């Protein structure tokens, strides 16, 4: 089921939650609405579901104006962050709830619920109550309940936000596999950029009720359209052209790459910076001020005294070990990766 969001606006009092939003969601795709709290993501999700009404604009579902559609007739499954399971019902009864409202036969309900329990890998827990389940299990039950009515669209509002990191990672992979099996048009709201990158076919970046950028995860990361998008997706070094280091860094790029000198700042990712123990004409001395091990890479805060500038640098453990530093007081030398992409510059 395709969804067209046509010039949607919404205010709550004086707060502009959504400001002329236009977005097309293809049938069978999985889209992440990414942005900070209060940026309008959940408001848009509720408008699509029919839980809220826009002040302006139209939602089109499969080419039809959904303005007059009831919540039930939209055939949309909705999963909230807090699961919204019925505490006094068993897992089985929670999943069966929507089917019973549709007056489906007992045998068909039993068959479908058992099939869904197997799908979410909880086939032996149908007799338990929500309080007897872990957070990850409760979220899978909430998803099973949403899928029971065979929705054409699945809406997920921060579905993994209340779970610990390991469970979130496992559920992200599980959700992606689930989507590949059923190809239900899915919209997930998240403020977690890693979650959006792992799950979505496309990411829609929200900021203050507006869309900043729409694109595939890798395109959003490699070619951010605005400083906000660049900063939202990972660490960034923001460097002013007023600092002499700008000329040094920009001179590292091939001449064929354009430089828009009227712009006042440019942005560069920490992994685009190289550090070494060897001095040469294309690098400058620096010192490490802080080090943080983060899984399979190391985050360094370095200070380049010649330019009075602090930089964030990301290197692999092997690259760091090759430096053979005895202390942080030793000089290191900074340059750019020769095959790295041009830093993205913005007018501000």
Swiss-Prot record:
Keywords: ATP-binding, Chloroplast, Nucleotide-binding, Plastid, Sulfate transport, Translocase, Transport. Its EC number is 7.3.2.3. Its main location: plastid. Signal peptide: none annotated. Residues 3-233 form the ABC transporter domain. One of its GO terms (cellular component) is ATP-binding cassette (ABC) transporter complex. GO terms for molecular function: ABC-type sulfate transporter activity; ABC-type thiosulfate transporter activity; ATP binding; ATP hydrolysis activity. It catalyses: sulfate(out) + ATP + H2O = sulfate(in) + ADP + phosphate + H(+); thiosulfate(out) + ATP + H2O = thiosulfate(in) + ADP + phosphate + H(+). It is an enzyme of class 7 (translocase). It holds the Pfam family ABC_tran. SMART domains: AAA. Belongs to the ABC transporter superfamily. Sulfate/tungstate importer (TC 3.A.1.6) family. This is Sulfate/thiosulfate import ATP-binding protein CysA. It comes from Mesostigma viride.
